[in-house]
């Protein structure tokens, strides 16, 4: 579900923007389309 607050991800879930060092982990789904958490990339 694309939104202005969601970075562009590749198929592995890693952000394509090299300036960012965070990955987005989708946790289940909520009424608004899902709960999203930010976590530091390993």
Curated annotation (Swiss-Prot):
Keyword terms of this UniProt record: Protease inhibitor, Serine protease inhibitor
Record GO terms (molecular function): serine-type endopeptidase inhibitor activity
Expressed in which tissues: Cortex of potato tuber.
Domain of life: Eukaryota
Gene3D superfamilies: 2.80.10.50
Described function: Potent inhibitor of animal pancreatic trypsin (serine protease).
Family of this protein: Belongs to the protease inhibitor I3 (leguminous Kunitz-type inhibitor) family.
Protein name: Serine protease inhibitor 8
Source species taxonomy: Eukaryota, Viridiplantae, Streptophyta, Embryophyta, Tracheophyta
């Amino acid at each position: 579900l694309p939104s202005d607050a969601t970075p562009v991800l590749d198929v592995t879930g890693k952000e394509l923007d090299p300036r960012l060092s965070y990955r987005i982990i989708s946790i289940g789904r909520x009424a608004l389309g899902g709960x999203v958490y930010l976590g530091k990339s390993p």
